[in-house]
Amino acid sequence: ENGGVIVVDGAQSAPHMTIDVQALDCDFFAFSGHKMCGPTGIGVLYGKRKWLEEMEPVEFGGEMIDFVELYDSTWKELPWKFEAGTPNIAGAIALGHAIDYLQELGMDNIHRYEEELAAYVLPKLQAIDGLTVYGPQDPNFRTGVIAFNLDGLHPHDVATALDMEGVAVRAGHHCAQPLLKYLEVSATARASFYFYNTTQDADRLVEAIMATKEFFKHGTI
């Protein structure tokens, strides 16, 4: 309504559910490859043709130039004007296969399974004294990505202690500092369940958090 451009960071949603950019009506949608079982160093950017045609290239090199003059150049049609030089060929092939694999599993099936895992583990996490789970408390309104904090402990310390228990989580800002500022927290720990995780993994997380609480009973390191 006000002429703003809507850019969606879909790195944490594209791997977990069906995405329809037409229904979202966003101007841009971006996601990374490694969160979709693909390789690092590659991602996907969707953009409405209107904006992509207006934008100037940000990198320059072979295959994106139409004509070169002494003081000016013209660019090829979309998408080539944004794909300068030798692309990450191996990464593109690998990401394509990863996306095909997820499509074969079915994004709706993945989302449904994650909801089941969330429904299993959320009550267990919510029952831990001093633990705050961020986001919807109803598993029907979330994926398997669960951000949390333990009272009085920095998420980095929590992540280190969980690692000692054999449980890998992410700790930090998660590229969402404005949201964390709104929540009035410096950072969070984040457990990410996916289609390859099980209820046994969920139980292991809960056990590791309880062990972490015991470890820090007398204060941080």
Model regions and ranges:
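Pyridoxal 5′-phosphate
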Residues: 1-221
